[in-house]
Amino acid sequence: MIYLTLPYNTLATQEKLIIAHRGASGYLPEHTLESAVLAFAMKADFLELDVVMTRDEQLIVMHDLTLNATTNVDKIFPGRSGTNGKYLTMEFSLAEVKKLRVHERSNKRGSGPAFEGRFPYESLLFEVPTLEEILQLVNGFKQSHGRVMGLYIEIKGAEIHRQYNLDPAKKLLAILERYDYREASDPIWIQSFDAEVLKTMRQKHKTRLKLLQLIGENRWGLSATDFDYLKTKVGLNEVAGYADGIGPWMNQVVTGKNISGDLKLTGIVTMAHHFNLKVHPYTMRVDRLPDYAETFEDLLHIFFNLVQVDGIITDYPDRAVKFLEKTADH
């Protein structure tokens, strides 16, 4: 464990990325076109989004493999849920998904919003976008504003998709090729918690796009990937063979403070940088601060100026952009 205290002006801010988590999701329901528009207006460098497939092999933008938590699917298609009461995206056509309306994310009980004080939970103003609609939106921004917002796309649930004979990674690469995303220099990252998905994209599909290995906890059951191994020096060296960066959970970077008030760091950022891997931790929220940060700006200072990460994923891109602008002014 590493203990660290450093002054506020330790690090220059150039090339630090602000990645808007599911759009400007602190202000509007996640994964909607409107949330993406707001993220662009807030000057986010990248738009983070998750993709899953429908029954008719269309990529839609949604975090979960089920429709329950963010749509009114139970009202529009009663009786269509599986034995566990879940509505899998792979069991619905795109036309059916387009009949749904998106609301603020539900809590795990489905009894109210996951985050109090955000956009009204009962509002049903929004719909589920397709990946291509997001791509067209970003292209439109480039033409009308002359500014590019990059894309930061996560492939969800490869194992479950395989059970339905669906291959979201292959479909994703084909769509991106049509929209001229081909090279490592293009403004796009593809991310996954599943190491095999990324290895297949790099080794079988020969993609040159930037890939990022997300790192979770083994107890989360996200994939067969051994995250404990990936957090080691040997594991990160292996990641560097197929990916360009890592996305650790922020609590895997900073674990708290010691009795003297110094930050306790795991050292994963230093190790990753040794292997030329970029580090973009997730997810920084104004309304979910860790114990070691008194304010959101304090949290940003810790990760940008002390830990020296290369970018952060946040529900509040405007606050992060303003922080970097203010730091640059000094």
Predicted segments with their positions:
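Phosphate-group recognition and catalysis centered on beta-loop-alpha active-site segments
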Residues: Y3-H330
